[in-house]
Amino acid sequence: MKAELIAVGTEILTGQIVNTNAQFLSEKMAELGIDVYFQTAVGDNEERLLSVIDIASQRSDLVILCGGLGPTDDDLTKQTLAKYLGKALVFDEQAGQKLDTFFAHRKHTARTPNNQRQAQLIEGSVALQNQTGLAVGGLITVDGVTYVVLPGPPSELKPMVKNELVPLLSASHASLYSRVLRFFGIGESQLVTALEDLIKHQTDPTIAPYAKTGEVTLRLSTKADNQALADERLNRLEAQLLSIRTVDNQPLRRLLYGYGEDNSLARETFELLKRSGKTITAAESLTAGLFQAQLTDFAGASQVFNGGFITYSIEEKAKMLGIPLVELQRHGVVSSFTAEQMAAQARCLTNSDIGIGLTGVAGPEALEGQPAGTVFIGLATKNKVESLKVVIGGRSRLDVRYIAALYAFNMVRKALLKSENLL
């Protein structure tokens, strides 16, 4: 099935609001195995809206119109679609009762005849009830084309789509099942190069790479009638691609850190710390607490984190962490020595199992002869202190700091997995 999204509202064209509904709807249609081929925005103008509907009806099987269901004169979506289809507007009793209840509880809010428009449906439509607002949506199929009208506010549209529209559409379509694989330590171009043959010859399942800040994800997708069949196909493709080696001969399996759209290196590390019963601390310079902030984003962070340090200046590194100032001056702030000492001292001072030290040059200027983007990360445990140097080139200060924290999380993650013999 080919779908088209039409956003109705002059405020979208003038840049007053961002059309976030398009992203949400495209995602939901993809989950249903419905291909969205076109997205259009049109102002509150009957003539132009009629033209857009006519174009959409000739090239799409499903036309979804968002916005323009309110009570004012410029809310003309239902009226215009009804005119195009040659149908009348009728009153939906359930939506009308909701209007009655709404105004009965708001004695000081005047009800006008225009409010009745919010309870109108195109004749022959299936009503899509609005759980969070007043304007009823609708679905109607005419001459093989299904038309859907939805309210514009996301707070009304999203529940209506999830609870009303999706069940209606899913009954007649194979669903799209997806799995997101997350990689760290490889760029998008390197990953795509490694998977070139698979991507070039893909049919179903499909592979879609996405570059994120400091990491890359792969979305594997297949259309199937059930989860078991989808898992079988996705498992086969995943095993195939993870066995492939990069240009520097690393198996992709070793660069995979987790799964899921909402996952992160911080979350993976946090879960490993909880599972292993380990505690962690950090002393941060260039990241200024970013590592600790991300770690404590998760409920239950106090199980693995007691506290830490932000030691931005050389004097604070000496005073708060007890590192001899003369040694810091001799080795330099941006050095493996300083990163290791920060990690080791933070660990001892907080009686934690693991200590992390982050120091470097966020930029844009060089520091101590080290170019912008140079980062040293120290990791200390009871038995070992080590450090990692990375150069994050061509990035903003914000990106350097963010990616430095990612490297720190990955360093901890790998150390924890190694202790469990999982790497």
From Swiss-Prot:
Record-linked InterPro entries: CinA, CinA-like_C, CinA_C, CinA_KH, Competence-induced_CinA, MoaB/Mog-like_dom_sf, MoaB/Mog_dom
Highest taxon in the source lineage: Bacteria
Name of a matching Pfam family: CinA_KH
SMART domains: MoCF_biosynth
NCBIfam families, per the entry: cinA_nterm, molyb_syn, PncC_domain, PRK00549.1
Family from the record: Belongs to the CinA family.
Name listed for the protein in its UniProt record: Putative competence-damage inducible protein
Organism from which the protein derives: Streptococcus equi subsp. zooepidemicus (strain MGCS10565)
Source species taxonomy: Bacteria, Bacillati, Bacillota, Bacilli, Lactobacillales
